[in-house]
Every structure is written in C-alpha cells, then in structure tokens.
Amino acid sequence: MGGFQFKQFRIEQDLCGMKVGTDGVLLGAWAKGGRHILDIGTGTGLIALMMAQRFRSSTIEAIDIEENAAKQAQDNIERSPFSQQIKVFHTSIQQFNSKAINYDAIVCNPPFFENSLSCNNHQRTLARHTNSLSFNELISCCIKLLTSNGVLSIILPTTTRNSFETEALLQGLYKT
C-alpha cells in the first residue's frame, strides 16, 4: 500500500504493522493540544505530525515500541516542515524517560484487542493487541506524565470503552 499525502506532509507506511486509518486521522484532527505533547504509539508519526500542524508552538515527543515504526515515523517527520518540532523515540511507554517533562496533552491510538487471537505479523500484533500495553499500564503512565491540568486524548472502539473508563476512574483519571 502506498503513502498518503496530507495538506503539508506525506506519510509513508511500508515499514509499519498498522497503516494509516480513519481512527488516527480523526484523533489527530480533534485531540486537544498544549505546549508539550506526547504521542504514545506513534506508528507512522501521523498523529504527531497532525498535532504539530495544528499547534505550531508545541514541542512534541513521539514514542513507539516497534523499531520499524519508530524509524518510519522519524523518516516521515524528517521530510515534513515540522521536523524541528517533533522528536521520535524507540521505546515503550513503560521505559520512557521524559526527563522530568510533564505533558499538557497526551494523544494515543492504543492497542485495544484484549484476550484475542494475534496475527502472524509481529508488528501488527504489537500495534493492535494489549499484550505489550494494558489499559492499566497506559493509564498509570499517563497519570505520571500529565500535568495537573493535562488532557489525555484517546480513541477506542465502543467494545473496550467501558473497561478503559472504569480503569481510568479507579486510577483517578476523569473524563471531561
């Protein structure tokens, strides 16, 4: 599958397990921004780039656990007009060290398949299944990394929404 041309940047996706989809485009279009933004599971870098395009004075850090995805994001960002605004890290959120930066906004299109069959493609399994990042871990990490008024913007299927919201409430993260 080829790349996608957006208004001010192009996304190549040949190295990523998960390709550009409606979920990521929607999240990048409506997520709240801030001065410091973190994109968890950046994949192609699409959401980080959309946030940079929308919030020109923001600094954005984008992370991905999958090496090829982090490389693809880095390549896409380097070819964009927003390369000075975004830094990409190949790491898991559990291992990520933000150097004491707290984020005003975190965006995430997380893996959401729980207890389901994984596919033969390891990259796709990492991107789609909660084995490497449970909702509990994601919420816990976000709470530690957000400022006191910070916002987590996330997109989930309706089938997992209730379990995510319950876990968020149990950990003290509230829906606005």
Where are these predicted regions, by residue range?
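Class I SAM-dependent transferase core
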Residues: 1-33
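A generic structural signal for alpha->beta connector loops
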Residues: 8, 57-59, 83-85, 149, ...
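Short loop/edge segments at beta-strand edges and connector loops
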Residues: 13, 89-91, 156
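Conserved Class I SAM-dependent methyltransferase catalytic core
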Residues: 16, 133-176
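Conserved SAM/SAH cofactor-binding pocket of Class I
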Residues: 26-100, 105-108, 114-119
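Hydrophobic alpha-helix-in-membranes signature
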Residues: 109-110, 156
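Mobile active-site "lid"/loop adjacent to the S-adenosyl-L-methionine
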Residues: 110-137
